C-alpha cells in the first residue's frame, strides 16, 4: 500500500511534549503551556459519533472531577472538525445513556485537527492505518511538560 502521507515519529517517554496552538470546543489553546504546573492527559480518538469513542468520552467526563483533584487536565483530540465535535458532544449530553451515565456534559477541551498537524506531531498517524483518522493514543505529560507515559 503506497501513500504520500507524511508520517512523523511518535515522541518518546522523557521527551518534552510538542507545543502547538489549536481550536477546541472550549476555545483556543496553547498546549501544553496553558496548563503549566498541571499534569496533562492528551488522548486521541479515531472519530466522533462512534460507540467506543462515545463511551470513552462519557467515562472521562464522568470522572473529570477526580482528575482535577489530582491536578490533571484532560484534553481530547481527533481529526474531525469543530462543528462535528460540538454536535457529538451535544448528542452525548442530550441522548446517550451508557452504564447509568446520562446527561453527561463534556467540559474538557476537544481539539479540532482537520489538518492533522497535531496528530502528526504526536505520531498518531501510523503507516498502514487510515489516512483520515488518528490512532488511539494517550500521553501522560507531567507539570514540567515532559512525557511520562504513552499508551
Protein language model regions, located:
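Chalcogenol-based redox active-site neighborhoods
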Residues: 1-151
